From Swiss-Prot:
GO terms for molecular function: rRNA binding; structural constituent of ribosome. GO terms for cellular component: cytosolic large ribosomal subunit. It comes from Photorhabdus laumondii subsp. laumondii (strain DSM 15139 / CIP 105565 / TT01) (Photorhabdus luminescens subsp. laumondii). The keyword Acetylation does not apply. This protein binds to the 23S rRNA, and is important in its secondary structure. It is located near the subunit interface in the base of the L7/L12 stalk, and near the tRNA binding site of the peptidyltransferase center. The gene is rplF. Part of the 50S ribosomal subunit. This is Large ribosomal subunit protein uL6. Pfam families: Ribosomal_L6. The lineage of its organism: Bacteria, Pseudomonadati, Pseudomonadota, Gammaproteobacteria, Enterobacterales. GO terms for biological process: cytoplasmic translation. Belongs to the universal ribosomal protein uL6 family. Keywords: Ribonucleoprotein, Ribosomal protein, RNA-binding, rRNA-binding.
Amino acid sequence: MSRVAKAPVVIPTDVEVKLDGQVISIKGKNGELSRTIHSAVEVKHADNQLTFAPRDGYVDGWAQAGTTRSLMNAMVIGVTEGFTKKLQLVGVGYRAAVKGNVINMSLGFSHPVDHELPAGITAECPSQTEIVLKGADKQVIGQVAAELRAYRRPEPYKGKGVRYADEVVRIKEAKKK
């Protein structure tokens, strides 16, 4: 049985929560996020807290309640503080630049790679080999970071490619004669 769902999500005073049937909307200084809640989960909003419990008749009720609680907690953190994800470009001639909502990258291909950012996500390049993604939605930030990394994954022999800042790339030893 999940114990995650038993802990309530505390809502700060500057965050507004609206519960409309199975759709919950959370609004804060960094924007507004909404999500549809699984039908097996019952959400109650009282005393600046969100509490989660399974509905009767669902086998996976506690599991869904725990998942929903984690998603709601991420939404509250997103609209108050926001999320960041850092990427590094490792390789000779690999560089990135941001123009509006488009990230332009040179990754060793015969053409530059342009990636358009979705709404609510901003990017900046502190240096030519670093990309910092910022936004309120944790899932969208992770998805965009994964898409950028997929253009040129770190290869195992020299480690060249696009990697997360906290990623450790295991380098293989070259074949010996």
